């Protein structure tokens, strides 16, 4: 499981510098560099009433430090200009969730996180700017589920979890070198179902940040630059992906059968897929795709224990799906969001995958080969919008 997140961080570290590449120079120098300190107040979101058996309080402090690299008009990058000069940031944070008061016999742990972030300023007026931020990284939790010592903490099932955050920052330039910001974030911690139980945690956070620029930042302005060529029209993506899934239904069956049910063996998930996407601008493409999936499972055994009978429709490790995908492009990097429907599945009576799924991820497109352009990527697949299913690593070709 830990190996999978290290692979994810390696892929992010390799692909994100593409966002910071300019036509004439790199942004990884002192003239582009800045450092930040921030603090936030985090509140556990409990819309489903899941924390009532564990928590007495819901608020915790967070503090962090960042090192950022801002793109500038003088970089002469069409991509940076098109996205209104985004910024690439690397950060470390401490979330004192271990300070939450809990019921006797259980505890929540602190989170120590490292991450990479993309900051965008979609609105500017004088010394004020406003825009979204996306953070992706890994968190070390000081406390996780244990069937004997911490049975109520079904939210964190492993020591290392993914850290995914999204938010909005309102920034005020108070000096050529100094900036302050008011921030609002949504924060999610999950291990992608590599080990159960893994209900994950969701938090809302508000705070403030102080940033110091090593060099006075340039006045951000849209300039006229030569547009790069791009492959307009229909493009095909052929890919395969794999990951693992530790099933909570299997855990329930094992516990009902008298076993501890921890840890539950992670089982293989694999797929092959084809997408046809229409690239109608340098920044956007939209498409449709089909996938054939394989899932190692214990569906029949789970039903016999939990339901007392087999599913008359039978069982199959294979299932199929169709999906709609929206891509956002930045040089060789693309981000995508997919919404799909399972067209065939035989998962039994106890398993509840639902009919629909969601996928969010990124792909880094390698230099072109004679036939097409290879890419490496990752996806987080979910059901019911908030149920993690699998962290998938993919490889494919675009032509």
Task: State what each model feature region is.
Residues 21-32, 74-86, 123-130, 173-178, ...:
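Short loop/turn motifs that connect adjacent beta-strands in outer-membrane beta-barrel proteins
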Residues 31, 59-65, 84, 106-114, ...:
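Residues that define the transmembrane beta-barrel architecture of outer-membrane proteins
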Residues 33-37, 86-90, 130-136, 164, ...:
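Transmembrane beta-strands of outer-membrane beta-barrel proteins
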Residues 37, 65-71, 114-122, 134-138, ...:
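Residues on the lipid-exposed face of transmembrane beta-strands in outer-membrane beta-barrel proteins
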Residues 39-45, 71, 92-98, 136-144, ...:
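Transmembrane beta-strands of outer-membrane beta-barrel pores
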Residues 43-64, 101-108, 246-272:
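Surface-exposed strand-loop-strand hairpins of Gram-negative outer-membrane beta-barrel proteins
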Residues 83-144, 210, 280-343, 364-370:
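Gram-negative (and chloroplast) outer-membrane scaffold detector with strong preference
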Residues 202-223, 362, 387-399:
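Outer-membrane beta-barrel "beta-signal"
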């Amino acid at each position: 499981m830990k190996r999978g997140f290290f692979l994810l961080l390696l892929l992010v570290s390799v692909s994100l510098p593409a966002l910071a590449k300019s036509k004439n120079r790199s942004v990884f120098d002192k003239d582009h560099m800045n450092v930040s300190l921030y603090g936030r107040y985090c509140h556990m979101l409990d819309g489903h009433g899941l924390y009532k058996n564990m928590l007495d309080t819901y608020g915790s402090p967070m503090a962090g430090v960042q090192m950022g690299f801002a793109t500038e008009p003088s970089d002469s990058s069409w991509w940076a200009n098109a996205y209104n000069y985004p910024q690439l940031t690397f950060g470390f944070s401490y979330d004192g969730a271990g300070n939450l008061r809990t019921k006797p016999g259980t505890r929540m742990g602190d989170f120590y996180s490292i991450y990479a972030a993309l900051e965008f300023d979609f609105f500017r007026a004088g010394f004020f700017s406003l825009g979204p931020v996306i953070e992706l990284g890994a968190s070390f939790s000081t406390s996780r589920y244990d069937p004997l010592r911490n049975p109520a903490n079904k939210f964190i099932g492993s020591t290392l979890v993914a850290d995914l955050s999204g938010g909005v920052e309102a920034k005020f330039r108070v000096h050529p070198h100094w900036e302050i910001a008011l921030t609002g974030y949504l924060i999610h911690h999950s291990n992608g179902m590599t080990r159960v139980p893994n209900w994950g945690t969701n938090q809302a956070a508000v705070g403030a940040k102080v940033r110091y620029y090593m060099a006075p930042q340039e006045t951000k302005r849209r300039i006229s630059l030569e547009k790069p060529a791009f492959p307009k029209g229909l493009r095909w993506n052929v890919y395969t992906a794999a990951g693992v899934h530790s099933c909570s239904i299997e855990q329930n069956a094992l516990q009902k059968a008298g076993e501890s049910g921890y840890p539950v063996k992670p089982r293989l998930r694999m797929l092959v897929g084809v997408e046809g996407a229409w690239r109608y601008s340098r920044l956007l493409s939209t498409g449709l795709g089909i996938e054939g999936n394989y899932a190692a499972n214990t569906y029949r055994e789970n039903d016999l224990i939990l339901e007392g009978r087999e599913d008359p429709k039978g069982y199959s490790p294979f299932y199929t799906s169709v999906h709609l995908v929206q891509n956002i492009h930045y040089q060789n990097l693309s981000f995508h969001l997919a919404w799909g429907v399972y067209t065939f599945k035989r998962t039994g009576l106890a398993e509840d995958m639902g009919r629909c799924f969601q996928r969010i991820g990124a792909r880094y497109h390698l230099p072109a080969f004679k036939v097409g352009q290879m890419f490496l990527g990752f996806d987080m697949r979910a059901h019911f919008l908030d149920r993690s299913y699998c962290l998938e690593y993919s490889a494919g070709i675009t032509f």
